[in-house]
Amino acid sequence: MMENEIHIKEINPINVENGVIINGFPSSGITSAIATESMINTSNFELGGIIDSDRFPPISIIKNGEPNYPARIFVNNDLKVAVFSSYLTLDVSLHRTAARLMLDWLQDKKASVIVSSITVKGTTGTEIFGVASTGNARGKLVNAGITVVENATVPGISGVLLNEAMLRGIDVIVLLVSSDKEFPDFQATSNLCTTLSKLVPGVSCNLDKLEKESKIIEEQIKQAETDTKDLSDNMYR
């Protein structure tokens, strides 16, 4: 349906052939959004495109005095890595559309794997677990020293990515990050950054800056969420 359409507008050259796409959409906690934002700030990513939809709330994120779309694609063409970054927590009705958009874009760009993550309730520890859509993707987890989970429930965009990718024969990896806090904590975000760097050689987070950055990014995401809710309440009264 047209009203569900999400589209990508590329504004700079993007080359991620045989590379990696990282999903930073917050659909189950915002730890992934904070980690990917920190990674973008550390690993020489540049803006590659914007992600937009008539279903997205009309909002601009002002950073360093300049307006920004709330959902964007950042790319490091040297590393062949693209990051879907978002300050929006998408409505559940858009999760399937967003996941399929990512998979279609992977096929169009001839990338090799999507890496996503979710936050699961549990004691915050150093180990992060993983699930995957194919045997090949599970092999990537094993090679990176990440324990593969045999039984789990994966909600949201990450869950749709796994199911759709299994049918299409596309490699998708979802990392399960444990946290015992309602909101993201520094340790969980740090653990995710470290694990992503194992799966995606060359990317990194500056852990010294991460604690300070994570609080700022979290506040920005929460503010965008609050402003979005206020807009929705006023629009649909």
Per-range role (PLM):
Residues 92-138:
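Internal, conserved structured core segments that host functional sites
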